[in-house]
Swiss-Prot record:
This is Spindlin-1. Coiled coil: none annotated. Belongs to the SPIN/STSY family. Changing Y98R: Impaired binding to histone H3K4me3 and H3R8me2a and impaired ability to activate the Wnt signaling pathway. Residues 53-116 are annotated as: Tudor-like domain 1. InterPro entries: SPIN/Ssty, SPIN/Ssty_sf. Changing Y91A: Decreased binding to histone H3 trimethylated at both 'Lys-4' and 'Lys-9' (H3K4me3K9me3). It comes from Homo sapiens (Human). The gene is SPIN1. One of its GO terms (cellular component) is chromatin.
Amino acid sequence: MKTPFGKTPGQRSRADAGHAGVSANMMKKRTSHKKHRSSVGPSKPVSQPRRNIVGCRIQHGWKEGNGPVTQWKGTVLDQVPVNPSLYLIKYDGFDCVYGLELNKDERVSALEVLPDRVATSRISDAHLADTMIGKAVEHMFETEDGSKDEWRGMVLARAPVMNTWFYITYEKDPVLYMYQLLDDYKEGDLRIMPDSNDSPPAEREPGEVVDSLVGKQVEYAKEDGSKRTGMVIHQVEAKPSVYFIKFDDDFHIYVYDLVKTS
């Protein structure tokens, strides 16, 4: 987790963004934003969690290879049920959600749970918040030269713990981000796209159980012929064909429509 390059996600190639192993210096931030803002295998065995730190503020050191120890502070958003060693974390000053096995990763040192709790805020427009979930959006960011950069993506869900934030992913960079999207919408920087082209959800019989890929191992063949493996860790309720994937060689959380790609 070294200092980020300071590039917008679009400056990362799609090979880096979705299909190649990403080293620690790829932890990134949308610094241009002026606001605060496959084949499926059997399930992987899970280990038991040590303690419940979801909702806590944490800090820890991070050392990779021969590099110096850097200090990181953030909020634990979730503990992954199919792999309780894995936590989803929003680090201060970064817009991506990261997945780390905090108690097992040897690169993590001096993990400390901070006494300060996450402040809860009343959401300003509950109807708008519900309306945008599952919708395609155009999200505007201001670049260093003052011009606007448009990113098309999908609002996936309200983020856990930090209740005024939303999970979102982008077509050009299919990893999990989180922003305070209601603020961006009211300031004209987020536009909800018409959903007339979306296909209607399939009809289900009463009591029908839809198969889920959560907990399954996945394998992805890269362009160079090598393979990367990972686990499906979450199914998006608003778009059941969309899943979160945590690859073994990366700490970003990837977002893929596995029905379209299977």
